[in-house]
């Protein structure tokens, strides 16, 4: 499996030269550029580019037991944080986010005193913890080192004929506040494999992808693209279910909820979207 790292200002995308959205393989052999097209579309959005003069992929792979032990440690770490969790923290966080307290609790958040941030577990399609997303009071987001991507959802959810897919834990809490069966991806281009597994396990027949209302980004040729919608389309194309894409009138679902959106408002907007297979 190829290991990817995000581009930065110090190490921008080698294709479009931008400091965000794109990724480069750890061995320097490949680049997924979200702006410059190639003949190979990436399943998570963007296009795959083979970099010139790149070194061959390494043959060595770490022992698989190491990964399993690490995930077990993350699950134990989250469980230990949950033992200290108190309804006062929950009430304050729910109030600051503008979501329902019970809906937020279904995601099993915790407070991490070492990082001075709230901790949201990321799970695979079977419910096991695969990583921990951190969010401080200023809204800054990062993850506990050593974990991987996963989904934000209620581990008690056993079945759902229709699933709403959001971006991030707070939008997922907003969807749960509206009374939806929901799961959140870490970003608009990740969590695909876990979501496929979750959809199969829950018996989902339909999936509504709720895309962030992002501003337009520019490709090198000057054409515009919208990360949230592009990521939603890429996801819809690989789920193998009836899907539709909904874009809230505010920057994301939680912002729309804060502005007073109701379940009826959501259903009216969703009804205007077209169901498609793939």
Language-model-detected regions and their locations in the chain:
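Short, acidic/turn-prone active-site loops that include or flank metal/cofactor-
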Residues: 186-192, 212-214, 249
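TOPRIM metal-binding catalytic domain and adjacent DNA-binding surface shared by DnaG-type primases
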Residues: 1-22, 27, 31-34, 42-130, ...
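Short, surface-exposed amphipathic charged segments that create phosphate/polyanion-binding patches used
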Residues: 197-202, 254-268
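Acidic carboxylate-rich catalytic motifs and surrounding loops in phosphoryl-/glycosyl-chemistry enzymes
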Residues: 245-252
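Short phosphate-binding/catalytic loops that engage adenosine nucleotides
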Residues: 180, 240, 244
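Phosphate-handling DNA/RNA-contact segment within nucleic-acid enzymes
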Residues: 112-206, 221
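Acidic beta-strand-to-loop metal/phosphate-binding motif
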Residues: 165, 205-226, 246
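Short, aromatic/basic amphipathic alpha-helical patches
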Residues: 219-240
